[in-house]
Amino acid sequence: MQRSEIWLISLDPTIGAEIRKTRPVVIVSSDDVGTLPLKIVAPLTDWKLHYAEIPWMTAIVPNRQNGLEKPSSCDAFQVRSVSVERFIRKLGSLDAKTMQAITQSLVEVLGIEE
Protein backbone atom coordinates (compact mmCIF):
# COMPACT_ATOMS: atom_id res chain seq x y z
CA MET A 1 0.00 0.00 0.00
CA GLN A 2 1.68 3.15 -1.24
CA ARG A 3 0.98 6.82 -1.85
CA SER A 4 -1.05 7.48 -5.03
CA GLU A 5 -2.63 4.01 -5.07
CA ILE A 6 -6.40 3.70 -5.31
CA TRP A 7 -7.96 1.08 -3.08
CA LEU A 8 -11.51 -0.05 -2.42
CA ILE A 9 -12.13 0.21 1.34
CA SER A 10 -15.00 0.07 3.81
CA LEU A 11 -15.54 3.43 5.51
CA ASP A 12 -18.44 2.28 7.70
CA PRO A 13 -19.31 2.89 10.44
CA THR A 14 -19.40 6.65 10.07
CA ILE A 15 -21.03 9.53 11.95
CA GLY A 16 -22.83 12.63 10.69
CA ALA A 17 -21.68 14.04 7.34
CA GLU A 18 -18.67 11.71 7.00
CA ILE A 19 -18.53 10.06 3.59
CA ARG A 20 -19.63 6.46 3.99
CA LYS A 21 -19.96 2.95 2.56
CA THR A 22 -17.49 0.86 0.60
CA ARG A 23 -15.78 3.10 -1.94
CA PRO A 24 -12.48 3.91 -3.63
CA VAL A 25 -9.93 6.05 -1.82
CA VAL A 26 -6.51 7.37 -2.77
CA ILE A 27 -3.65 6.93 -0.32
CA VAL A 28 -2.20 10.39 0.41
CA SER A 29 0.16 9.59 3.29
CA SER A 30 3.88 9.54 2.66
CA ASP A 31 5.54 6.16 2.14
CA ASP A 32 8.39 7.40 4.37
CA VAL A 33 6.45 7.88 7.61
CA GLY A 34 4.31 5.80 9.91
CA THR A 35 4.88 2.57 11.75
CA LEU A 36 1.28 1.89 12.74
CA PRO A 37 -0.98 -0.16 10.43
CA LEU A 38 -2.73 3.02 9.27
CA LYS A 39 -2.89 5.00 6.04
CA ILE A 40 -4.12 8.53 5.43
CA VAL A 41 -6.63 8.47 2.60
CA ALA A 42 -8.92 10.80 0.69
CA PRO A 43 -12.19 9.25 -0.49
CA LEU A 44 -13.41 9.29 -4.07
CA THR A 45 -16.99 9.99 -5.10
CA ASP A 46 -18.90 10.17 -8.38
CA TRP A 47 -18.06 13.32 -10.36
CA LYS A 48 -20.71 16.02 -10.48
CA LEU A 49 -20.42 19.09 -12.67
CA HIS A 50 -20.70 21.57 -9.77
CA TYR A 51 -17.57 20.02 -8.18
CA ALA A 52 -15.52 21.97 -10.73
CA GLU A 53 -16.23 25.07 -8.59
CA ILE A 54 -15.12 23.45 -5.31
CA PRO A 55 -11.37 23.90 -4.68
CA TRP A 56 -10.88 20.72 -2.63
CA MET A 57 -12.48 18.43 -5.25
CA THR A 58 -10.08 17.01 -7.85
CA ALA A 59 -11.51 15.44 -11.01
CA ILE A 60 -10.25 11.98 -11.95
CA VAL A 61 -10.91 10.53 -15.41
CA PRO A 62 -11.20 6.73 -15.41
CA ASN A 63 -8.46 4.80 -17.23
CA ARG A 64 -6.60 1.49 -17.11
CA GLN A 65 -3.93 2.84 -14.77
CA ASN A 66 -6.30 4.03 -12.04
CA GLY A 67 -8.81 1.19 -12.42
CA LEU A 68 -11.84 3.44 -12.01
CA GLU A 69 -14.97 2.72 -14.03
CA LYS A 70 -16.56 6.18 -14.02
CA PRO A 71 -15.56 9.84 -13.71
CA SER A 72 -14.75 10.51 -10.07
CA SER A 73 -13.64 13.23 -7.71
CA CYS A 74 -11.18 13.12 -4.83
CA ASP A 75 -12.66 14.89 -1.81
CA ALA A 76 -9.67 16.32 0.08
CA PHE A 77 -11.99 17.80 2.73
CA GLN A 78 -12.85 14.26 3.88
CA VAL A 79 -9.23 13.13 4.38
CA ARG A 80 -8.79 10.69 7.28
CA SER A 81 -6.56 8.07 8.82
CA VAL A 82 -7.86 4.50 8.50
CA SER A 83 -6.73 1.04 9.54
CA VAL A 84 -5.25 -1.15 6.81
CA GLU A 85 -7.85 -3.72 7.92
CA ARG A 86 -10.45 -1.62 6.04
CA PHE A 87 -8.65 -2.14 2.72
CA ILE A 88 -10.38 -4.65 0.42
CA ARG A 89 -8.50 -4.56 -2.89
CA LYS A 90 -6.24 -2.37 -5.00
CA LEU A 91 -7.87 -0.81 -8.06
CA GLY A 92 -4.91 1.06 -9.56
CA SER A 93 -2.83 4.20 -9.10
CA LEU A 94 -2.90 7.87 -10.05
CA ASP A 95 -0.51 9.68 -12.37
CA ALA A 96 1.84 12.33 -10.97
CA LYS A 97 -0.18 15.27 -12.33
CA THR A 98 -3.41 14.17 -10.64
CA MET A 99 -1.57 13.40 -7.40
CA GLN A 100 -0.05 16.90 -7.45
CA ALA A 101 -3.53 18.42 -7.83
CA ILE A 102 -4.77 16.37 -4.86
CA THR A 103 -1.73 17.40 -2.82
CA GLN A 104 -2.45 21.07 -3.58
CA SER A 105 -6.06 20.58 -2.46
CA LEU A 106 -4.81 19.09 0.82
CA VAL A 107 -2.47 22.06 1.33
CA GLU A 108 -5.43 24.41 0.96
CA VAL A 109 -7.85 22.39 3.12
CA LEU A 110 -5.32 21.93 5.93
CA GLY A 111 -4.06 25.52 5.79
CA ILE A 112 -0.46 24.45 5.27
CA GLU A 113 1.86 27.26 4.23
CA GLU A 114 4.51 26.18 1.80
Which residue ranges define each predicted feature?
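Conserved functional hotspots at enzyme active or ligand-binding sites that engage polyanionic ligands
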Residues: 1-114
